[in-house]
């Protein structure tokens, strides 16, 4: 399967649960190498939108093209290959396998692709970069929450993905580890030009990204409208 480069294009995306429309006609573009945050209050549809854009949850209607390929028109084999080669995922909870060591968890995507030996040295390099060199052979239950999340980020990066999709990657971390993760993602985007789309409710985190997309009740709104809605909500309290 041949891949081309052209970023992410979302057109009139909608998601309905029962009689409720959660995502309401979202259209947006993300260029190659961009670092974008999805912001908004809890329940605004941020995570739902991220999961649809990243191929994990099909929309009710609308189209999502990544590198000019309509991802929901791919067959199962194509989307599996696309995810494994071009996408990395980071979640609020790391979902690491406790029976394996840090390095074994990082190498899981390479193992699935049958490329374990080819990526061994790079996996070790990532853990060293993330200050985990002396813990790469530790099982996950011996790591702190911040260390485990760094392992999860290394796992997302090990196949050199073009796209990183992150859903509240600092949501379960203290302020010190939050800054570590923020700095790692900023460095990855700057040095490797990896396109990153991150969901966050943290304004400090969002301010570190190149661009913010503001969601209110499933709609993308301008910064001016977003600030006005926030101000109105505070006044109503």
UniProtKB/Swiss-Prot annotation:
Q: Which CDD domains match?
A: ABC_MJ0796_LolCDE_FtsE
Q: Does the keyword section mention Cell inner membrane?
A: yes
Which InterPro entries does the record cross-reference, listed alphabetically?
AAA+_ATPase, ABC_transporter-like_ATP-bd, ABC_transporter-like_CS, MacB-like_ATP-bd, P-loop_NTPase
EC annotation from Swiss-Prot or TrEMBL: 7.6.2.-
- Pfam families assigned to the protein according to its UniProt record, in alphabetical order: ABC_tran
SUPFAM superfamilies on file: P-loop containing nucleoside triphosphate hydrolases
Q: How does it sit in the membrane?
A: Peripheral membrane protein
Entry superkingdom: Bacteria
Q: So where does ATP get bound?
A: 40-47
Q: Which SMART domains match?
A: AAA (SM00382)
Where does the record place it?
Cell inner membrane
Q: Name one GO cellular component term.
A: plasma membrane
Report the residue ranges that make up the ABC transporter domain in this protein. Answer: 8-237
Sorted alphabetically, the keyword list is: ATP-binding, Cell inner membrane, Cell membrane, Membrane, Nucleotide-binding, Translocase, Transport
- Which proteins does it associate with, and in what oligomeric form? The complex is composed of two ATP-binding proteins (LolD) and two transmembrane proteins (LolC and LolE).
The record, for PANTHER family, names: ALPHA-D-RIBOSE 1-METHYLPHOSPHONATE 5-TRIPHOSPHATE SYNTHASE SUBUNIT PHNL, LIPOPROTEIN-RELEASING SYSTEM ATP-BINDING PROTEIN LOLD
Instruction: Tell me the function of this protein.
Output: Part of the ABC transporter complex LolCDE involved in the translocation of mature outer membrane-directed lipoproteins, from the inner membrane to the periplasmic chaperone, LolA. Responsible for the formation of the LolA-lipoprotein complex in an ATP-dependent manner.
> What's this protein's family per the entry?
Belongs to the ABC transporter superfamily. Lipoprotein translocase (TC 3.A.1.125) family.
Q: State what protein this is by name.
A: Lipoprotein-releasing system ATP-binding protein LolD
